[in-house]
Structures are given as structure tokens and as C-alpha cells.
Amino acid sequence: MQKLILILSLSLMFFSCSPKVLYDDPRKVETLTINFSSTDLQIISQAMVDSLLQSVITNNDNKPIIVIEEVKNKTAEYIDTSIITDSIRAKLSNSGLVQFGVNIDELDGQISEIDRQQNEYYDENLSVEKGKLAGADYRLAGSLISIDKVKKKLFKTKKDKFYKLSLQLWNIKTGVMVWADEKDIRKTEG
């Protein structure tokens, strides 16, 4: 009986000391480290979308079709840049001013679905015809880079991290770059 009480007491003490998990506002500024954060994602994606939507491509009556390539990670750290790409795509799509075509990464899936609908199990009047994919007007591409600096003095270390997101929009028909912008973020620690 005493062993059981001891085990229960230790278990209660162990679990009562565990950290509590709380939900927080995803738009709240995150300053836990100088590494890439959710705040950085929100800042750079919104800045790029705002800039692109003020460009000449959205000043006419037609909604241009854009294919977006995944942002390339040229930093020294692992950053899943698909979250940057997805955030920019969602914000642009929600603006209602542009449309998105099938990019190279999604093309195989799109072709497979069209091919699947061409068999005898589908009503030919309700199936998608081959050769009807819309071609894109523009291609959006870019990269994320970082520069890391560390300065050590006696018992103190100061770290500086600089991020730059660069995006370019290319007219597919002419091969001309029609828009480009960059967003910088600098963080220091120590």
C-alpha cells in the first residue's frame, strides 16, 4: 500500500510540473529566437503581396493567370519555404485580382485526373476534355537568403541575422521581367 501511495504521489508530482499548453494569437509577434519565425513569414508574404497587387499586372480588367514556383531556400538553416509560397498564393488568390494556373509540380496530378475522366466509367458530357488547360500569363519565382554574424566579447555574444526575400514576376510570352521586389528583415540577439 505504501508503494502504491509513493508511486501515485510521484506521478502526481511529475505531471503537475509539466508545462501547460495554451493557444495564442497567430498574428502575435514571436521573439523567441532570431531564426525564421511565423512573424517573419507574415511580414514578408504580406509585403510582397501588397507590392505585387500595386503593379501593372492588376491594373486591367483581365485577371492574369500566374504560375508560382516554390521559393528557393538559400539560407544556412532548414526552412520549409513552401509555407512562404503557400502564404503568398493564398493572399493573392483571396485578393480576387489574379488566378493561378497549374505549376510544374502539380501538372502530373492534373494530367492524371484528366486522363482518368477519359475512360468509359465517366459521362463524356460531364468529363473534362483534353487540351483545355489554361496557359499562364506570368511566372512568379524567388528565393530567401540569410546572412549570419556573430560577435564575441569576453563573456557576451551578440548575434545578428539578416533575411531577404526576393521575388520576380516574368511575362511568359515575352520572357520579360515585369515586376520584382525584395523584403528585408534583421534580427539581433544578445
Which residue ranges define each predicted feature?
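Bacterial Sec signal peptide processing site at the extreme N-terminus
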Residues: S11-N35, G190
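N-terminal secretory signal peptides
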Residues: L32-N60
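Soluble non-cytosolic domains of exported or imported proteins
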Residues: N35-I43, Y78-I83, Y121, D160
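Glycine- and small hydrophobic-rich membrane-insertion segments that are intrinsically disordered
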Residues: L22-R27, I114-Q118, K153-K156
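A short, hydrophobic beta-strand-centered structural micro-motif
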Residues: A47-M48, L52, I66-E70, Y121-K152
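N-terminal segment of the mature soluble domain
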Residues: S51-Y122, K132, I172, V176-W179
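Amphipathic beta-strand/beta-sheet edge segments enriched in Tyr/Trp
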Residues: S18-V21, D137-E189
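Sec-dependent signal peptide recognition
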Residues: Q2-L8
